[in-house]
């Protein structure tokens, strides 16, 4: 009996000594595993973020059909950027893409950008001739995105220099044509009379939709136009070739084209922040800064929220994806499993210079991740 008590005491002593040591080791091991898991998750998200930024660069150039980023300096942009109402309204009222998570729909849109507004600056043409010793203005080349049956608006914008006294100005827009037998080289497009008050100059818009549509249907008829804005003394107030201090006052065309919406369907996903410990597939914030890229050719936005997807897609959570689950059950070794990918993406509006120094305001599809899921 005494020996039995001794064995019991020894056994209890071993439990007391050994027990806490084992528990501490297990706790430390568990903590180390958790820390290692968090570090791996952070590194994985950082790599995913970097890959997403590089992919965005490639996508933007591809969707705008640009082989390389346009090489336009800040000084050139300052000279080319019109100081005109339509462009200022676009910049002032520009709606940088909001992170709107209230709608759970998945956007189905085209891969290439759908243009809404194109601002075309005048360019030189070998066809233009001098009339009465004055260089002609202006000739416009049009993007292939502009099709005559999709044009909803076309405005010619011209700037009139300021006057010192109240003046009546006669504005005339002439279309250059092939010389006729009687020597006529142009035909009238629009004429209007304006009353100008002393002070600053003014921008005047003129509807040229019909002329533009004719040019698009018959490109060979596009020989250019001549702009005149004569005051009562015969002085031309129209800025056609800007002089000193007249940067941004060139004439230009503002063209609006149609856009066709697409259908959508429902979907849902998780939202996380950079400090989240969530291991499942989740959407994380990511801001794209075009100035950091050195992309001065993008006028607006200078930055936008793009977001990215990261996380695990465990088969145990796949009641929502029965097809993927059945494939895995049928061939567990041959299936790579679902990936955490965007399930809802939305477009951004962008104002930019293209490779031909034209200013384009367009919608670029699938540039913002709104939802993430396993698929």
Curated annotation (Swiss-Prot):
Modification(s) after translation: Synthesized as large precursor molecule that undergoes proteolytic cleavage to generate an N-terminal propeptide and a disulfide linked C-terminal dimer, which is the biologically active molecule. The circulating form consists of a latent complex of the C-terminal dimer and other proteins, including its propeptide, which maintain the C-terminal dimer in a latent, inactive state. Ligand activation requires additional cleavage of the prodomain by a tolloid-like metalloproteinase.
Known glycosylation sites: 71
Family matches, as SUPFAM superfamilies: Cystine-knot cytokines
Top-level taxon of origin: Eukaryota
Sites annotated Cleavage: 98-99
Pfam annotation, one family: TGFb_propeptide
Cellular location(s): Secreted
Proregion span(s): 24-266
Keywords: Cleavage on pair of basic residues, Cytokine, Disulfide bond, Glycoprotein, Growth factor, Heparin-binding, Secreted, Signal
GO molecular function: cytokine activity; growth factor activity; heparin binding; identical protein binding; protein homodimerization activity; protein serine/threonine kinase activator activity
Main localisation: secreted
Keyword field contains Cell membrane: no
PANTHER family recorded: GROWTH_DIFFERENTIATION FACTOR 8, TGF-BETA FAMILY
Task of the protein: Acts specifically as a negative regulator of skeletal muscle growth.
Protein name as catalogued: Growth/differentiation factor 8
Gene: MSTN
């Amino acid at each position: 009996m005494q020996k039995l008590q001794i064995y019991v005491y020894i056994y209890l002593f071993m439990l007391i000594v050994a027990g806490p040591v084992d528990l501490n080791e297990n706790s430390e091991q568990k903590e180390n595993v958790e820390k290692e898991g968090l570090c791996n998750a952070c590194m994985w998200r950082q790599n995913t973020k970097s890959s997403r930024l590089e992919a965005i660069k490639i996508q933007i150039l591809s969707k705008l059909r640009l082989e390389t980023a346009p090489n336009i300096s800040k000084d050139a942009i300052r000279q080319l950027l019109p100081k005109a109402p339509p462009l200022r309204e676009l910049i002032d009222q520009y709606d940088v893409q909001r992170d709107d998570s209230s709608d759970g729909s998945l956007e189905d849109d085209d891969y290439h950008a759908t243009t809404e507004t194109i601002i075309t600056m005048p360019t030189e043409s070998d066809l233009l001739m001098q009339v009465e010793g004055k260089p002609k203005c202006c000739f416009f080349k049009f993007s292939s995105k502009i099709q005559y049956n999709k044009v909803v608006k076309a405005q010619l914008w011209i700037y009139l220099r300021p006057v010192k006294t109240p003046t009546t100005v006669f504005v005339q827009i002439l279309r250059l044509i092939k010389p006729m037998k009687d020597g006529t080289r142009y035909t009238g497009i629009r004429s209007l009379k304006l009353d100008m008050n002393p002070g600053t100059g003014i921008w005047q818009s003129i509807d040229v939709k019909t002329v533009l549509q004719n040019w698009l249907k018959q490109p060979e008829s596009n020989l250019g136009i001549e702009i005149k804005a004569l005051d009562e003394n015969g002085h031309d107030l129209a800025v056609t070739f800007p002089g000193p201090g007249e940067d941004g006052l060139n004439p230009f065309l503002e063209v609006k084209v149609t856009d066709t919406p697409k259908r959508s369907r429902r979907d849902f996903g998780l939202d996380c922040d950079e400090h989240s410990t969530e291991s499942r597939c989740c959407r994380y914030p990511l801001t794209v800064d075009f100035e950091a890229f050195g992309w001065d050719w993008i006028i607006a936005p200078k930055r936008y929220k793009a977001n990215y997807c990261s996380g695990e897609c465990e088969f145990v959570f796949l009641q929502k994806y029965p097809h993927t689950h059945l494939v895995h059950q049928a061939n567990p070794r041959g299936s790579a499993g679902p990936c955490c990918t965007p399930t809802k993406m939305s477009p951004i509006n962008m104002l930019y210079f293209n490779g031909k120094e034209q200013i384009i305001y367009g919608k670029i599809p699938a540039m913002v991740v709104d939802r993430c899921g396993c698929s």
